[in-house]
Amino acid sequence: MALRFYSHNGCVLTVGAEAFLLQVLVVVVSLHQQPLNVKGVTEKSGCDYFQGNWVYDNSYPLYDTSKCAFIEKEFNCQKNGRPDKLYLKYKWKPSGCDLPRFDGQDFLRRNKGKKIMFVGDSLSLNQWQSLTCMLYTSVPHTAYTDVRRESLSIFTFTEYNVSLMLFRYAFLVDIVAEKIGRVLKLDSIQGSKIWQGADTLIFNSWHWWLHTGRKQPWDYIQEGNKYYKDMDRLAAYEKGLSTWAKWVDSNVDPSRTRVFFQGVSPDHMNGSDWNEPQAKNCQAQKQPVFGSRYSGGPHPAEIKVRNVLSRMVKPVYLLDVTMLSQLRKDGHPSVYGSGGHLDMDCSHWCLAGVPDTWNQILYATLSQH
């Protein structure tokens, strides 16, 4: 009997489906790249892109979302009726330098013939959609294909033969259907078969580790030969990330594949975190937290990510977007997401918006290596 692997959104991948997806991932030998490390570009340029503050810039946003028909409803805040636009006008200013302005044509030329894959949860979807729109509006009217199949989405700029891929695998490790129910296997990473062959990999995982009740997509957690009804979620997260890290160390050739980890994307559900205790969530927030410090302090999952990356042998670049995103309490859909007033969304980000900055940093880093 074929194993059935569950993605976070309920899609089922059988072994047969994996075989189909593997056919899609034709391995293209990339140009040799200088290996990246966890500190990344800061060592090369003397600039830390992740320390700075948000400043008003009337030339922003970088693109008009209405020009991108493929943007998901949940991120399209203006189309969903958000009345304010000031949140669109802020750019990230690193403390010691300027972040290069995004050049979509240059990005496509540099990555011609390449496959860039985002792997993770709906925050990966958020960043993937941001990058597709940033690129598409840089080369308007260019031909593209947008293929969706189960948990894999492939957006290809046909003129450049650049494929932006998204694989929805929220935990990075496997959830497998067994007789006792759905099992989150902290030591198993069979989904990695889909990732092989990509030239650039951008991983993300966090938010789904916290879900309980009806939103929890597993019934048991397995570590080794032991099954648990539950365990400390931060501990489980670190164990799952460690399995992912071992896969990278054992399977990635840094001369052919560049690996990034998208830092933990924060939510804004408690105004005390930004010195507004009267605010119960992100609704009606119209400006960032100004300055370069966030009173809520470091994110606990961020510490786990750093612990895991510090033990890795192969180079991984940390897109350390947590703090710069913590300052953007105004950037979420709130009631202008897919659920409207029935579903407060202070986890995802409006597009155009904060994920565009994540991709600017991704572009700057790739350009320097």
Regions found by a protein language model. Give the residues of each.
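A compositional signature for long Ser/Thr(±Pro)-rich, low-complexity
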Residues: 2-369
